[in-house]
């Protein structure tokens, strides 16, 4: 019986990255032997055990055989006869198919160390094409390790394209697709995830609303990058630089879906694209089971981002209506989220990545002024029922007007 550290822990240690999860493989053991040593079995489909003290996972060495469609269409065989090499062979990428024994000795039968040194994401074997989930996983690894200089091997990208064309991506559950998207959004370079899916023809299948943006032109005056798909990638990249909030990053990703619906005769103009995109966002979110808080923020950003860009030109009453629509009185955290998504949109343009975005500060100042208006003096003044709400609205508009007046005085020579 031999114990090995495997997978991400070995990979991340070789990359000098923080090791978060430590997974182990056991060769030459039976489930009964593991139980006798105090391990607790948790795996149903194949034997996985939890260490009695550390709680870390220990899986018996196993092989897999394709028996059906999708990432769940596999039968597993675990026995003391399965070798280290056989277990590592079933893994997705060579960088994830390295093992380390208890003495620190590395076992690398498929060249994972060389691929780490050369910054290459490469499949372990031709069985790679049997699991459609690997398209999403490799795209996510490409996003996660983009800053370390990793790229996908051409032959691996070709296999990912083969999977896309096989029809097996449709077998992925909505929950699994969103889980991979959410993990990708949390990486340093989430735009790479979308780019890779587009490269291997998976984007059109999994996220057709986003795929439809590529090739759609925009006015060069406002968008030197021209292509709406490229703009979307740039906005997502900026959102990742601005904050760690995945709901903001998702809103950035889908803020311009409506541009795909602009009539060809009107291109490159996109009148009302923010509102046109609302239905598309709802469809995408329903299909992939996006959480409600992600969806609601995305809808607000799509609807309001053009107004926020021109916020200094808006009347005070219009601004208060925006605060109402966004329900900022009850959900003030949305103020920062909307501001960040709009800033990402403004900076996600060729040559404008370092531009300032004063609209965000003005947006926040106006809301904070309006939010300071107290209801108590209005009630004490004798107003009742609907009059209270009307007076509160008027006072909020006055507070915003004062901020606007101060801004105008500051801007005047």
Curated annotation (Swiss-Prot):
CTP binds at residues 8, 11, 91, 137, 140. PROSITE patterns: HD. ATP binds at residues 8, 11, 91, 137, 140. Residues 228-329 form the HD domain. It catalyses: a tRNA precursor + 2 CTP + ATP = a tRNA with a 3' CCA end + 3 diphosphate; a tRNA with a 3' CCA end + 2 CTP + ATP = a tRNA with a 3' CCACCA end + 3 diphosphate. It holds the Pfam family PolyA_pol. Magnesium is required for nucleotidyltransferase activity. SUPFAM superfamilies: Nucleotidyltransferase, Poly A polymerase C-terminal region-like. Its EC number is 2.7.7.72, 3.1.3.-, 3.1.4.-. Its cofactor is Mg(2+); Ni(2+). The keyword Isomerase does not apply. GO terms for molecular function: ATP binding; CCA tRNA nucleotidyltransferase activity; cyclic-nucleotide phosphodiesterase activity; magnesium ion binding; phosphatase activity; tRNA binding. Mg(2+) binds at residues 21, 23. InterPro entries: CCA_bact, HD/PDEase_dom, HD_domain, NT_sf, PolA_pol_head_dom, PolyA_RNA-bd, tRNA_CCA-adding_enzyme. CDD domains: HDc, NT_ClassII-CCAase. A single active site specifically recognizes both ATP and CTP and is responsible for their addition. Monomer. Can also form homodimers and oligomers. Catalyzes the addition and repair of the essential 3'-terminal CCA sequence in tRNAs without using a nucleic acid template. Adds these three nucleotides in the order of C, C, and A to the tRNA nucleotide-73, using CTP and ATP as substrates and producing inorganic pyrophosphate. tRNA 3'-terminal CCA addition is required both for tRNA processing and repair. Also involved in tRNA surveillance by mediating tandem CCA addition to generate a CCACCA at the 3' terminus of unstable tRNAs. While stable tRNAs receive only 3'-terminal CCA, unstable tRNAs are marked with CCACCA and rapidly degraded. Comprises two domains: an N-terminal domain containing the nucleotidyltransferase activity and a C-terminal HD domain associated with both phosphodiesterase and phosphatase activities. This is Multifunctional CCA protein. It comes from Shewanella sediminis (strain HAW-EB3).
């Amino acid at each position: 019986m031999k114990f090995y550290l495997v997978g991400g822990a070995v990979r991340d240690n070789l990359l000098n990255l923080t090791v978060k999860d430590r997974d182990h493989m056991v060769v030459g053991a039976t489930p009964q032997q593991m139980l006798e040593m105090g391990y607790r079995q948790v795996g149903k489909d194949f034997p996985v055990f939890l260490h009695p003290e550390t709680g870390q996972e220990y899986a018996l060495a196993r092989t897999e055989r394709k028996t059906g469609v999708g990432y769940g269409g596999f039968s597993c065989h675990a026995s003391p006869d399965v070798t280290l090499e056989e277990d590592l062979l079933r893994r997705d990428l060579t960088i994830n198919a390295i093992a380390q024994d208890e003495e620190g000795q590395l076992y690398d039968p498929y060249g994972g160390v060389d691929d780490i040194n050369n910054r290459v994401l490469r499949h372990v074997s031709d069985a790679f094409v049997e699991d459609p989930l690997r398209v999403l996983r490799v795209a996510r690894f490409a996003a996660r390790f983009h800053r370390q200089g990793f790229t996908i091997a051409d032959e691996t990208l070709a296999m990912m394209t083969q999977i896309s064309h096989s029809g097996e991506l449709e077998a992925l559950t909505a929950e699994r697709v969103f889980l991979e998207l959410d993990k990708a959004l949390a990486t340093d370079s989430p735009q790479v995830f979308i780019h890779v899916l587009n490269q291997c023809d998976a984007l059109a299948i999994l996220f057709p609303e986003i795929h439809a943006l590529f090739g759609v032109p925009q006015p060069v005056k406002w968008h030197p990058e021209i292509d709406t798909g490229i703009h979307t990638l740039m906005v997502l990249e900026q959102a990742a630089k601005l904050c760690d909030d995945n709901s903001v990053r998702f809103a950035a990703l889908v803020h311009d879906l409506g541009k795909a619906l602009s009539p060809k005769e009107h291109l490159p103009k996109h009148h009302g694209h923010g509102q046109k995109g609302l239905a598309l966002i709802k469809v995408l979110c329903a299909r992939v089971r996006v959480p409600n808080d992600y969806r609601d923020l995305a809808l607000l950003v799509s609807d309001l981002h053009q107004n926020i860009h021109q916020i200094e030109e808006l009347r005070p009453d219009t601004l208060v209506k925006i605060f109402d629509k966004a329900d900022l009185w009850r959900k003030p955290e949305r103020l920062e989220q909307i501001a960040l998504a709009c800033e990402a949109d403004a900076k996600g343009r060729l040559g404008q990545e370092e531009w300032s975005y004063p609209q965000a500060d003005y947006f926040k100042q106006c809301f904070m002024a309006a939010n300071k208006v107290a209801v108590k003096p209005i009630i004490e003044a004798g107003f009742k029922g609907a009059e209270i709400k009307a007076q509160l609205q008027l006072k909020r508009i006055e507070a915003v007007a004062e901020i606007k007046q101060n801004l105008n005085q500051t801007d005047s020579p």
